[in-house]
Amino acid sequence: MDDAPVEIPITDALDLHPFRAEEVRDVALEYLTVARERGFRQVRLIHGRGIGMQRANVQAMLRSLDFVQNFWDDASLGATVVLLSGKD
């Protein structure tokens, strides 16, 4: 198995489906950090609808980040919309 880093294009949305559950926190944190550095103020983390475990884990992480101003569900897309503060 190739453990080389995978570069993820930075757009206004990140689909978390391709990642293993144990990778999601690190991947989402890296994505949010880079998105903020590149000037994004609002992004979507797509975690799916399912039973809500991935959503709960993502939102728990978002509560711990000081550069996240707010977030809310977009249930129709199975996503959480995240409002980021501007760069320092």
Residue ranges: model-predicted function:
Residues M1-D88:
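Long, charged, low-complexity intrinsically disordered regions
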